[in-house]
Design a protein with these regions (language model features):
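Conserved beta-structured recognition patch
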Residues: 47, 95-148, 303-315, 586, ...
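Middle-to-C-terminal accessory/interaction subdomains
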Residues: 147-155, 244-272, 277-283, 288-289, ...
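Surface-exposed, proline-anchored Ser/Thr-rich loop/turn motifs
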Residues: 716-739, 750-755, 782, 800-803
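Intrinsically disordered, low-complexity Pro/Gly/Ser/Thr-rich segments with frequent PxxP/GP/PP motifs
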Residues: 66-92
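A structural motif detector for short, solvent-exposed N-terminal "entry" segments of globular domains
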Residues: 7, 16-63, 99-103, 120-125, ...
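C-terminal tail/sorting-segment detector
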Residues: 773-774, 782-803
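Extracellular Ig-like/FN3 beta-sandwich strand-entry sites
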Residues: 104, 211-215, 668-670, 707, ...
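Short, compositionally stereotyped local motifs that mark structural "simplifiers"
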Residues: 19, 74-78, 84, 125-295, ...
Length: 803
């Protein structure tokens, strides 16, 4: 209880008094800041007859830091209320610069002389509730009153206790009994099956016998108390799935109310697709309880979060909607905490998407997802969105398969790069929409590329300092390969951040790829398409055109495309991966496809067209590259190593370790070859078996001709293990060794600091067989040494000790 002495003392020293009257540490939809939306807030009340100038006063959550947030010049009228929002990184000086933890905390108010004026120690508060004063007593408020007096009729003593339930979420047999227990005899339990806040008609008075899959939401009520926080459970009965399962517990009216439900057309929808004006086009969030189960129905993640309908013109109007899952700071758990994607070692995500397939809905339903997974597995240098197909339930009712994906936003950068999401610049489309941060730096990059000749290395290097060029190339090549005609003017994002200043592209939405856009060959030539006048004003294409003026970049671009056509873009490899992904979800499509799309047979047919596109793509691209860059047609070459296993090879951007390697490249566009010799082997030369040409450098550049076969030729180390006696020795040792081929020999002795202290060469050839050499060590100081025996084929080492 607040002391009257405290108020009197403050009036005496400051000529007025004020009180921290109410606090809301988890504001979702109660009080909206005009500039920043729904933020935590605190209310100050002036209980005096005089107006107050708050300048010089301060708020803090740290008693030892009384000036943490100073009030700006604000006059608070007599008996008036001032509501102040809070944000950890505010833009306006009128916003408190720290947050209020929902689990409880203390906020202090200090005078200009750092004297404590007031404080409020608040307990854990549920979202949208507040805690404040009525007649010097603190109450909980289910209906906060920012800017107005607190109402004793709406004040509560606290919260009822959440009921306990005997069984956690999972799979159970028919007839299993669910028992709920109140913590106190004065508390009554209510529950619902449709995700709605339970009402009095759903009174719990006896165990529930499971007869079907159920999603239960339960609360407890008590006199003078706010209803307890909800408890959620999902019980699967006679369910069997080969994919992980997501259940979304949600007030069914929030989704399906004809007037207000976010899944529905609503009263203002245009009659024809994509039904602009429909409820599902609104950026409206609703609260849900999210649960994620593995295929054994074991609960692996669960949290309160928000959802909103997700996607563009090709997605939102579909019968099954894409849903964005949004972790919120207002709840106990802000991040989805599980390793959802096998392809990435990540286990924290602020946002996830349950995607319907977008433009691929009721086709393969997985095209974009399968391509992303494949390119991640292939190690391409692009920011890609991992994929995990899941079976979705809503309030315990089967809904269908959706593609769980990473969200292409600033929190993707946080999860994948461990960077501050508030320091990310994320731009969208050809128009460089500022999704987050600012476009200033990227506009400067575009202007520089357009205003300077990048054929000059000085200018090219400046762009290279601003742009991750290797990633830029891989990003463009993926889009060009799949022939994505919903790009590059749309479905494009690029980012940089403090700590990662080079711009990178974030790839998403290839739904319209892997199919023909017309009947003729030019319609499939995607590089020629983006370089023509149709997209000439696109800044991303302008950067590519500027870079292509540089001879080194142009050679890299062509060779990288060829490298990928020979590996990651290989038709057999891509379609094998798509087939694996198809097989992974096939057992579930028998329920999903008829529910939403029609005959399951038509689903299988969708993959025939994809295979036809993939099978013909390499030839089309080779033809296009030759045409665009005025090159001869591609030629076939082979890379090999002799003897087998003696070396690996770096071919342009490819690290080769399996031989022979066969690929296609362009004559007049030089390729790079580097031999990387394994330990115990000696490099002799590169040999072109077609021409018998030999090159004696490890790193070479060659102009490929048809049927070239470049081979790394090596010698194995043919020295048998050496034997030294006596060892330790005083003055003389005998070195015994065997050779499998004739060779000159050199013996050297090195001290432990690496200094050569003794060396003897034997230029005459030692024949194949066993040999002995006597050595005088009398000139050496006592100690430990390393003896090296070197031949034309290798080197062996052994430790010796001089007494």
């Amino acid at each position: 209880m607040r002391s009257l002495f405290f108020i009197i003392a403050f009036i005496t020293t400051s000529s007025f008094a004020q009180v921290i009257n109410e606090i809301c540490p988890s504001n979702i939809e109660v009080h909206e800041d005009f500039f920043a939306g729904f933020l935590d807030w605190l209310e100050v009340y002036n209980p005096t007859d005089d107006a107050i100038n708050l300048e010089g006063y301060a708020l803090s959550d740290d008693y030892s830091n009384p000036s943490k947030w100073p009030f700006p010049p604000i006059n608070l009228s007599s008996y008036a209320y001032l509501t102040i929002t809070a944000k950890d990184d505010p833009i306006l000086i009128s916003t408190i610069s720290f947050l209020f933890p929902r689990r409880g905390g203390t906020v202090y108010m200090f005078s200009p002389t750092a004297e404590l004026v007031d404080s409020i120690a608040y307990p854990e508060i549920q979202p949208n509730h507040s805690y404040g004063l009525i007649d010097s007593n603190y109450y909980y408020f289910e209906a906060p009153s920012p800017g107005d007096p607190n109402n004793s009729e709406t004040g509560y003593k606290g919260y009822a206790n959440s009921p306990s339930i005997n069984l956690g979420s999972g799979a159970f047999e028919v007839g299993t009994e669910i028992v709920m227990t109140a913590v106190l005899p004065s508390e009554t339990i209510y529950y619902s099956y449709n995700g709605m806040n339970p009402g009095e008609e759903e009174f719990y008075d006896s165990p529930i016998s499971l007869d079907q899959t159920r999603s239960i939401r339960a609360i407890a009520q008590a006199d003078s108390m706010i209803n307890s926080p909800s408890v959620y459970r999902t019980y699967f009965v006679n369910a069997n799935h080969d994919l992980p399962i997501v259940n979304i517990g949600v007030d069914s009216l929030d989704l399906f109310d004809n007037e207000t439900g976010i899944y529905m057309m609503g009263p203002d929808a245009v009659a024809t697709p994509p039904h602009l004006g429909a409820n599902f086009w609104e950026d409206k969030e609703v609260h849900v309880f999210y649960e994620y189960f593995n295929t054994d129905f074991e609960l692996e993640d669960a949290m309160n979060c928000h959802i909103e309908i997700f996607g563009g013109i090709g997605s939102r109007w579909r019968a099954m909607k894409s849903i964005q899952l949004r972790g919120k700071k207002t709840y106990d758990q802000t991040y989805f905490s599980h390793n959802y994607f096998e392809e990435k070692e990540l286990d924290e995500f602020r946002r996830l998407v349950l995607r319907n397939g977008g433009n691929d809905f009721c086709n393969s339903c997985m095209k974009d997802a399968a391509l992303h997974n494949y390119f991640i597995e292939s190690g391409l240098n692009v920011d890609l969105l991992a994929y995990n197909p899941v079976v979705v339930y809503i309030n315990g009712h089967y809904w269908g398969i959706q593609n769980m994906r990473e969200k292409a936003d600033r929190y993707y950068v946080e999860s994948n790069y461990n960077l501050d999401p508030d320091e990310v610049n994320l731009l969208g489309q050809a128009t460089l929409d500022e999704i987050d941060g600012e476009a200033t730096e990227f506009i400067a990059l575009t202007d520089y590329a357009n205003g300077n000749d990048l054929a000059i290395d000085l200018h090219y290097n400046w762009v290279d300092d601003q742009l991750d060029i290797n990633s830029f190339v891989d990003y463009f090549l993926i889009q060009l390969y799949v022939n994505n005609r919903d790009w590059p003017n749309f479905n494009l994002k690029v980012w940089n951040a403090v700590g990662h200043e080079k711009w990178r592209y974030l790839l998403y939405d290839m739904d319209v790829g892997l199919k023909y856009n017309g009947t003729g060959l030019p319609e499939q030539q995607s590089l020629a398409f983006i370089l023509n006048n149709a997209v000439s004003s696109n800044p991303h294409v302008q950067i590519l055109e500027a870079l292509l003026a540089n001879e080194g970049f142009r050679r890299y671009f062509i060779n990288r495309y060829c490298d990928l056509l020979n590996t990651a873009f290989d038709a057999q490899a891509i379609y094998a991966s798509i087939s694996d992904q198809k097989e992974k979800i096939e057992s579930e499509m028998g329920m999903h496809y008829p529910k939403w799309c029609g005959s399951i047979a038509s689903w299988h047919e969708r993959f025939i067209g994809q295979k036809g596109f993939i099978d013909g793509r390499e030839l089309i691209i080779h033809h296009e590259l030759a045409e665009v860059f005025e090159l001869p047609q591609a030629v076939d070459l082979t890379i090999d190593v002799f003897p087998a296993g003696a070396a690996t090879v770096q071919l342009n951007s490819l690290a080769l370790d399996e031989f022979p390697f066969a690929g296609s490249y362009f004559n007049t566009n030089v390729i790079d070859l580097t031999a990387e010799i394994k330990l115990g082997e000696l490099f002799k030369y590169w040999e072109n078996r077609r021409t018998k040409e030999r090159l004696f450098e490890l790193q070479i550049q060659v102009d490929p001709e048809d049927q070239d076969e470049w081979v790394v030729v090596c010698h194995s180390n043919e020295i048998a293990e050496i034997d030294i006696v006596p060892n330790p020795a005083e003055n003389e040792i005998t070195v015994s060794f065997s050779l499998t081929s004739q060779s000159p020999v050199e013996i050297s002795v090195v001290d432990l600091q690496g200094k050569d202290v003794m060396s003897t060469s034997y230029p005459e050839f030692f024949l194949r067989g066993r040999h002995k050499i006597n050595m005088d060590l009398s000139q050496l100081l006592a100690g430990h040494y390393i003896l090296f025996l070197t031949t034309s084929y290798g080197r062996e080492a052994s430790q010796i000790i001089k007494l």
